[in-house]
Amino acid sequence: MPERPDVPAALLRRVRKVVDRFPECTEQDAWIGVCWRIRQATIAHVFGGEDQIFRITFRAEPAEVAAFEHLGPPYFKTDWGSNVVGLMLDRDTDWRELRELLTDSYCLQAPMKLASQVARPQVP
């Protein structure tokens, strides 16, 4: 079975640039990769797959989960958590969109008092 690659430092820096602005968000090593949490709730998890593709998972509004699944690659629905969606990361990743998705994930997982401190991106 192929090894899962470590998440490159440059990729971690890009994700940190987004999540480090969230109140009380903490980073920790996960069983594979790295995850970010608000208290005990995971808001994002980035990891390398056995296929050598890097992915990030996050939380989405329940109504949006089916839409992401329907879009297909680079999005995918996970087998755990009813509101967990994933995105395959590559050179074509839209980091502005990912910033919006991670912001939404934080706001879904954080207590209202903390979520209200975060400016959510405006949708045109």
Language model features: what each stretch is:
Residues M1-P124:
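Charge-dense, helix-prone N-terminal extensions
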